[in-house]
Amino acid sequence: MSENKKNSQEMRLKIKKYLELDNVTVLAGAGTSFHLGAPIIREVPEGLKPKCKDSITEYFGDGANPSYEDLFNCLQADKFLKEKKGESIDDINSVMVEMQKWLFKNCDTQKTSIHSLYNDDSQLSNNRYHYHEVFIKKLLQRPNNLKRANLFTTNYDMAFDYALDKLGVHYINGFMGIHNRCFRPEVYDYDIYYPGQSVSGKVHRAEKVLRYYKMHGSLSWVATESSPSNVYGIQEKTMDGSFEPQIDKQIMIYPCVSKKTFTLDLPYSELFRQFAQAITQPQSVLFCIGYSFFDEHINDIIYQALSIPSFTLVIANFKINEEIQKLKDLNDPRIIVLDPDDSEQSTFVGFVKNVMPDLYEENEQLIVSETMNKLYPTRQPVEDDKKDIIQDVNNKENESE
C-alpha cells in the first residue's frame, strides 16, 4: 500500500469516528463553491468600481482599493446617519443596489462557469452540484439516534440549497411558510417526526433532515417592511429568475465580516448564537471546509470552543494563511489541519472524494478488515488505527466528565 493511500485510509477512519460523535457541525466557506466558478470576494471587483468610484473616494480617498465588505459597511453607516438627520439617501441606495446586483449576478451558481481547473471533471459536466450532493449524502449517513447535523455556511450562493432540494432533504433554515416564507428564529428548535407503527404510540424521527444556517445571508433573502405576520421584515424568495435587487427590496447580505464592533441584528445575531450553541456542546466536532478564517466574529466563537476539552476542530482549506498557520502551530491534538498544499485533501472536491468517508461502505470494510485480522493475527495496522482513534475519543470523554 502506498504511503498516500495509507494516509488517506487513516484519515477517513479518523473522520468516520468524529462523524459518529453526537454533535457534528460543518462550517462551509467560499472554497466549497470555488469549483463552480463563484467569486471569492475580497476587494471591490473591477467591473463594479466605476459605479462605486465616488463612494470609494469619499470614504477612503483617491486611489484607494477597499474591500467589498468595507465599502458596503461605510455605505450602511452613512445611510444610517443621513436617515437620522433627515437627509436624502437616494445616492447611497443606488450604489448599494448596484453592489448587490453585481453580487446577485456573479454568485448565481446556476449561471457561473465551472472553474477551468475542473473542466475535465465528468461528474461536474453531468451535474454541477454533484460534490455538494455527495457531501450531504455522506453527512446524512450518521445514525438516526444521534443529534441532527448542523450545516453552517458563510456563502451567499444557493449551491447547498439546490443540492438539498434535489436530494429531497428537508432542511430547517429558520424560515416558516409556503407562499410567504418569513424568518422566525424559533423554527431552528423544531424537528420532524412521524407516528410509529407500534401500538405503544411511540414516534420516530424522520430521516433526511438537516439544520441549515446561512450566516452571512443569502441571495434569496429579501429585506421588507415589518408586519404582524413578518415581525423581522425578512422574506425568503424563490430563485426562479423573476427577482432582482431593488431599492425597496434589497437582498440580505452581511458584509461586515471584519468589523467586530459592528452591532449584530437579526437574523445575524440569532445565526451566530446558534453557531456558538452548536459547537460548545459536549463531544462536539467542527469541520471547517473551504473557510479561510477571515471572519473575526466566527473565529472568536471557534476559539472559545477550544476551551472545551472534548471539542475537536478539523480544517480543510486549500492554501494555508496566517490564521490557519497560527492554529496549526499550537500543536493541539484536537486541531486537525489537512495538508493545505494537497488538493486531493484540502479542496472541497478533494475532501468529498478522498477524505470524507461513506459510513455505510466504511462499516462494511471494517467488518472485512476485522475478519482478516483474526485470520492473520500478524497483520493489524487497520485494527491498531481503529483502537487509537477509539482511545482518543474515550480520553476526551473522560476529560469532559
Task: Locate each region found by the language model.
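Short, basic, glycine/proline-bearing loop/turn elements
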Residues: 1-3, 119-125, 183-187, 259-261, ...
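Gly/serine-rich nucleotide phosphate-binding loop at the start of the catalytic core
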Residues: 1-164, 169-173
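SIR2/sirtuin-family catalytic core signature
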Residues: 1-26, 32-36, 202, 261-263, ...
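Short hydrophobic-aromatic micro-motifs
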Residues: 26, 211-215, 258
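Short, flexible loop/turn elements at secondary-structure junctions
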Residues: 31-32, 156-158, 216-219, 293, ...
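Short, flexible loop segments at boundaries between secondary-structure elements
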Residues: 57-59, 181-194, 315-325
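Extended, H/D-rich, highly charged conserved domains that either
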Residues: 63-93, 100, 142-251
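Flexible internal linker/loop segments at domain or repeat junctions
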Residues: 231-273, 278-281
